[in-house]
Amino acid sequence: MLNILSIILILFVSSYDKSYGFEKTMNKIDLETYNWTKRLLVINLKSQDKEKLSYVDNWLFANKCIIEDRNINIVFFEDFKNKKYKKPPFLIDFGFWLVGYDGEVKSFSLEEKFVNEIFYLIDQMPIRQQEMLMYKKKC
């Protein structure tokens, strides 16, 4: 009888933990909500990687207008975690992902200098080519 009660208690506790974890992720935003509205630069850095973070911060500050002009949303993950966003399926390493309007990964790099290439990569995309014809540059 004691064994049966122990098993029931273990099953109850384990299902409670799983549902609690599920509730925590339910409130997070899925990056797919940005499909067809934003391009994404998804960055996943190690918490102790201060040099890369500083490099990216300086790049963001220097390129604010260009980032806005190309309709890019920057999403940071630290050690695969983000309080606001769900972890996307492609986030299996540390690095930098450029995600297009269609939600597909267009390019990936482990190196922070990749951020310097994304404007060129975006400007080669067909939708961006149309945007450049239709809209006046802001920067």
How does the language model describe each region?
Residues 2-139:
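Non-catalytic interaction/Regulatory regions outside core domains
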